[in-house]
Amino acid sequence: MKVAAIVPAYNEAERIERVLEVLVQCPLLHEIIVVNDGSLDATAEVAQRFARTHAASDKPPVRVLNLPVNRGKGGAMFAGATATDAEVIAFFDADLIGLRPEHVCRILKPVLEGEVAMAVGVFRGGRLSTDLAQILVPYISGQRALLRHLFTEIPGIERTRSGVEIALTLHFRRQHYPVAMVIVEGITHTMKEEKLGWARGVWARTKMYAEIARAFLRYARLSDLRHKLLLKREE
């Protein structure tokens, strides 16, 4: 099965290269797609330079998809998913710290071996703040592999912005698709407050949680509606 890694990135020029360096070392990947989500910094230039540097190597090719305006994480992920013909796609955040090739393989294998429709990477042993967040809400992890057609069929997924992971989780639960939670040791990511400063970081985090809440309410309602329709058919 063809496998593509998709890296949605917004203003990640200082961090994205270390993630790409790891992804190109994973033997299970056939291509890597960076989706530059309307960044205002040099994210596109860094990714394109990396792609050129590795073009002649035996590593999986890297290509950069530039979105003219910011569509949010869900929009960037959808753009990447529809830009490939890979049967399996894997999403990785552009600000990861401690990612290793074996982490990538561990997340991919349950899907490639036909055990599940989606595998979600859950941080452990990175640092307390991200470990705690993923213990409390592992279903919003951005590191996951899944069958591509199951992602692109989700209604409105391209409009979910930061709520994309909760939308994915609710949709898969509603459809009873099998999902595996895969522990990945030693990974964390750069916090918004570290990227933007305390005040702007807190505001960005608040906005992110609001988008997650909106997606939760929308897809939870869709789940309730489907359940009611099924009950009505059975009457």
Regions from the PLM with identified roles:
Residues 12-25:
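Short, well-formed alpha-helical segments that are part of the catalytic scaffolds
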Residues 159, 173-235:
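Hydrophobic helical membrane-anchoring modules
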Residues 2-4, 31, 167:
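Cell-envelope/extracellular polymer assembly enzymes that use nucleotide-activated donors
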Residues 89:
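Short aromatic/hydrophobic "clamp" motif used to bind/position activated sugar donors
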Residues 36-45:
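A conserved acidic beta->alpha catalytic loop
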Residues 67-84:
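Glycine-rich, basic loop-to-helix element that forms the pyrophosphate-binding segment
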Residues 119-133:
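Short beta-strand-to-loop element that shapes/binds the nucleotide-sugar donor at the catalytic cleft/hinge
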Residues 101-120:
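Conserved donor-nucleotide/metal-binding helix-loop-beta segment in metal-dependent transferases, i.e.
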